A protein has these predicted regions:
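A conserved active-site-flanking secondary-structure segment within enzyme catalytic domains
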Residues: 125-153
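N-terminal functional module of multi-domain proteins
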Residues: 2-119
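Short active-site oxyanion
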Residues: 103-108, 123-128, 159
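Accessory alpha-helical/coil subdomains and C-terminal extensions
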Residues: 180-224
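Basic/polar phosphate-binding segments, predominantly the helix-turn-helix DNA-binding elements
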Residues: 225-227, 233-269, 289-314
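A short, Lys/Arg-enriched amphipathic alpha-helix from helix-turn-helix/homeodomain DNA-binding modules
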Residues: 207-234, 241-243, 264-283
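Basic, amphipathic alpha-helical hairpins
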Residues: 178-182, 202, 221-235, 254, ...
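Conserved anion/nucleotide-ligand pocket segment
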Residues: 151-192
Length: 322
């Protein structure tokens, strides 16, 4: 039987804890129906016997205290409400235990913003990870030695797993159901909970808001210039001139501040503008393309699909109700 330890983090999202426990309970029930032994033993593990979660709205009582768990097979780090860095600091005392369990052979999985606490342990250094797309820039800034793949719904590498934004944790849980039981049971569980079992990409849900979580005012002004003039023919030399610095210095500072090249940033701004038009208007794909400054339909479609995870037409069909 797989011993599952759900961490009772301070400010944890209640649903992440409850849904995890409930899903494994349902899976055990399916197994018992077919005359098999339950596969998962689930416990809520905390540092204290009374934990405040969801911005102190609720109190939960862990089944067992951290110091009383010598070994577990799977550690679940739930998502946290509010500021991810503050939540990580609030729960930093879990980090040594998480690391020790991993070194003893346990798998460790983070949900949404829980990736910040997993990153804090140092276990993710040099490895892949995902989190909620809204935290992506902040995560990259504080953990540059981790390969963030924020377009992915889940990741799993060397016993370290993570899930993307909010409800992506359902796919993470199904991954463990399939791994420790069978594909057949994972499919049955997915149908029971009405989950798209093979959802792999959260790109269609990402909203690009600009990487402005930095202190370089000159680069912020350049970003604003791009966002106000994206429909025109922008080039790096032109934008550097508006900033009154050399192109080389501008490009270096831009990458340092935003984690994007200037060309990448321009593409992201253009595609975000296109997405908004496709969501709310009846304009054709070609009309939208011209409005954001593209002239080649194939190039536009390729760039759009690479960033949004689907074609412009598919994106419109997904979100537009006009």
């Amino acid at each position: 039987m797989i011993d599952v330890s759900i961490l009772a983090l301070h400010n944890a999202v209640p649903a992440a804890i409850a849904d995890t426990s409930y899903l494994f309970h349902i899976v055990n029930g399916f197994l018992e129906e077919s005359g098999k032994t339950p596969a998962f033993h689930v416990r809520l593990v905390g540092i204290t016997d009374n934990v405040k979660i969801s911005n102190r709205l609720f109190h939960i009582r862990p089944d067992v205290l951290l110091g009383d768990v010598a070994y577990t097979d799977l550690v679940i780090i739930p998502s946290m409400t509010g500021d991810a860095l503050a939540g990580t600091y609030l729960n930093k005392d879990y980090a040594p235990w998480i690391s020790a369990q991993y070194k003893n052979g346990a798998e460790v999985a983070s949900m949404c913003s829980g990736a910040f606490l997993l990153a804090y342990t140092g276990l993710l250094r040099g490895k892949e990870c995902t989190t909620h797309w809204a935290y992506a820039n902040e995560f990259r800034y504080y953990y540059p030695d981790i390969k963030l793949v924020d377009e992915k719904v889940i990741t799993h590498q060397n016993g370290l797993c993570s899930s993307g934004g909010n409800n992506a944790y359902w796919n993470l849980l199904l991954y463990f159901v399939e791994k420790y039981t069978s594909r057949e049971l994972a499919i049955r569980t997915a149908k029971f909970f009405v989950i798209d079992l093979d959802r792999k990409d959260q790109s269609p849900f990402i909203i690009f808001t600009g990487q402005k979580n930095h202190k370089d005012l000159l680069i912020k002004r350049a970003q604003e210039y791009i966002e106000q003039n994206y429909a025109g023919k922008l080039n790096v030399e032109q934008i550097a001139q508006t900033a009154n610095i050399t192109r080389r210095t501008f490009e270096r500072r831009f990458i340092k501040a935003t984690r994007n090249t200037v060309a990448e940033y321009i593409r992201l701004v253009k595609i975000e503008a296109a997405k908004k038009q496709l969501e709310i208007s009846r304009k054709s794909v070609s009309e939208v393309m011209y409005e954001i400054g593209y002239a080649d339909i194939k190039n536009f479609r390729d760039v759009f699909k690479r960033i949004a995870g689907m074609t412009p037409n598919d994106y419109r069909n997904k979100y537009n109700r006009e």
